[in-house]
Curated annotation (Swiss-Prot):
Adrenodoxin reductase transfers electrons from NADPH to adrenodoxin, which is involved in heme A biosynthesis and in iron-sulfur cluster assembly. Involved in the electron transfer to heme A synthase COX15, a heme protein that catalyzes the conversion of heme O to heme A. Required for the de novo synthesis of Fe-S clusters on iron sulfur cluster assembly protein ISU1. Involved in electron delivery for Fe-S cluster synthesis. Essential for coenzyme Q biosynthesis. May be involved in the electron transfer required for the hydroxylation reaction performed by COQ6. Its main location: mitochondrion. NADP(+) binds at residues 177-180, 223-224, 235, 414. It is a peripheral membrane protein. Its EC number is 1.18.1.6. One of its GO terms (cellular component) is mitochondrial inner membrane. This is Probable NADPH:adrenodoxin oxidoreductase, mitochondrial. FAD binds at residues 26, 48, 56, 100, 407, 414-416. Disruption phenotype: Lethality in aerobic growth conditions and also during fermentation.
């Protein structure tokens, strides 16, 4: 463990100091851009509440999508280059295991740094706000569920998951139809197909529990219609292609028929989606294009199903005598003539779906830091109030030297590539301001000598051990699942 005082000082070079709160893609891409593009010397420190870096890339990406995590290679190369003593212009430090606002106050960063960038992402959940949503066994948010199967130390051994009776889960409901909802559908409907999951970095504890679930049916429930689906074609295709394992996709004809959609009114991506669905809904031998006939279903036919369900609003989560979910009450919706964002509920037409597990995938929500109110930092619903990345006060004025990037700046939307673009744009504004800002004080220091934390070298030790554990288990990586395991992973080689 490293217990050192970080001092941004050099006898030869005056470096301006930048602190970034959060080590996920937005934080690391911001650091990368600053270190690669700044014409003036910088000392950049990333602060992370977990002992390990990479945030949503490490804990939010589907285990069977390792290519999405390629950004971690870029971050690692950057960290190694700029934390090396041989780099004379810029310096980089990683400080893990410290929560800004707790062990170190945000005000302390603001008082000791030339710029502070908040890139800590969205750590809350958007809610249904219906009876039964809270406290019902077998009801989880997508954020909780994804963090659990990805081995996040806050969730990996959470008793809500480990004590849940997965052997009773046959029917699943998922509220939402974005990419995260499709990821979760894929995990659940193919939970017993070892060739998909056994070599990934999915938590072995979670996978062993999921394997107990005899999942037969997953229903993705959306308030609006097919046109307003939030998923991408790539994610949807992956679900359709599970048919080779006997997994069949379904859409009720009242929600989808090719003739419903005039190609001249939609973009190319949507028209491809229509073609994809219309082809995959046909029997395998009746499909017209080879692209949709990659691998036939087994001769025994289909025994598991997922379904895209539309124009429904959840009204109530119903429990059994033991406090576990047993059904979901919903009503039909209809869209206004102008296809407005708010569908109209038909509360006189209520139905009930039998479900053994319910995942709410409504999006992640940003949460303000505890000091925001005291420091008069503006917060707008689920993200930090800002003007092109420059944070605003509660009264709408620019807060000096304080910035935001990523989801906490704009809300939980977009993929890692769009997060990168946002981080670069904010990084450019930070550089613009630093270049014209006043003279740097000769010594800016934050004393960490008595605070337990990890460094980049500590992460390298943890990383090496996780990869070695994974190799022994025939996986790409076997993550440490608790804070205790992560801290212990720092010791030794």
């Amino acid at each position: 463990m490293s217990f050192v005082q970080i001092r941004h000082i050099s006898s030869q070079i005056n470096r301006k100091t930048v602190s970034i709160v959060g080590s996920g893609p937005s934080g690391f891409y911001t650091a990368y851009h600053l270190l690669k593009k700044s014409p003036i010397p910088l000392n950049v420190t990333i602060w992370e509440k977990l002992p390990v870096p990479f945030g949503l890339s490490r804990y939010g990406v589907a285990p069977d999508h390792p290519e999405v995590k390629n950004c971690e290679e870029t971050f690692t190369t950057c960290a190694e280059e700029f934390s090396s003593p041989t780099n004379q212009k810029h310096k980089f430090s990683f400080v893990g295991g410290i929560t800004i606002g707790k062990e170190i106050l945000l005000k302390e960063l603001l008082d000791n740094q030339d710029a502070v960038i908040l890139s800590y992402g969205c750590t809350g959940d958007r809610k249904l706000n219906i009876p039964g949503e809270l406290g019902t066994k077998g009801v989880f948010s997508s954020r909780e569920f994804v963090n659990w199967y990805n081995g996040h130390p806050d969730f990996a051994k959470d008793k809500r998951f480990t004590d849940f009776d997965w052997s009773k889960v046959s029917k699943v409901g998922i509220i939402g139809n974005g990419n995260v909802a499709l990821d979760i559908t894929r995990v659940l409907i193919s939970n017993q197909i070892d060739e998909i999951w056994e070599n990934t970095d999915i938590s072995s504890l979670a996978l062993n529990l999921l394997r107990r679930a005899p999942v037969k049916d997953v229903k993705l429930i959306a308030r609006r219609d097919f046109v307003h689906s939030k998923f991408t074609n790539k994610e949807l295709r992956e679900l359709w292609e599970l048919e080779k394992y006997g997994i069949r996709g379904r859409i009720d004809p009242k929600f989808f028929q090719k003739e419903m959609f005039d190609p001249s009114k939609y973009d190319r991506a949507f028209n491809r989606r229509v073609e994809m669905c219309s082809e995959y809904l046909k029997p395998f031998n009746e499909r017209s294009k080879k692209n949709y006939k990659k691998a036939p279903p087994p001769s025994s036919g289909y025994d598991k199903f997922w379904e895209l369900d539309y124009l429904k609003t959840p009204l109530k989560i119903n429990r059994d005598d033991f406090g576990a979910i047993n059904s979901l009450s919903l009503c039909n919706n209809r869209l206004n003539e102008d296809n407005s964002l708010q569908p109209l509920k038909d509360v006189n037409n209520i139905m009930t779906y039998k479900v053994d597990l319910l995942i709410t995938s409504l999006g992640y929500a940003g949460v303000p830091m505890p000091e925001f109110s005291k420091l008069s930092i503006g917060f707008d619903k689920d993200h930090i109030a800002n003007k092109q990345g420059r944070v605003l006060t509660s009264s709408g004025e620019i807060f000096p030297h304080l910035y935001a990037s990523g989801w906490i700046r704009k809300g939980s939307q977009g993929v890692i590539a769009s997060t990168m673009q946002d981080a670069f744009e904010v990084g450019d504004r930070v550089i613009q301001d630093l270049v014209v800002s006043g003279a740097l004080s000769l010594e800016n220091s934050i004393d960490l000598s008595n605070i337990k934390h990890t460094t980049w070298k500590d992460w390298e030790r943890i990383n090496k051990k996780e990869l070695l554990r994974g190799k022994k288990e025939h996986k790409t990586r076997s993550k440490f699942l608790t804070f205790e395991e992560l801290w212990n992973g720092v010791e030794g080689i």
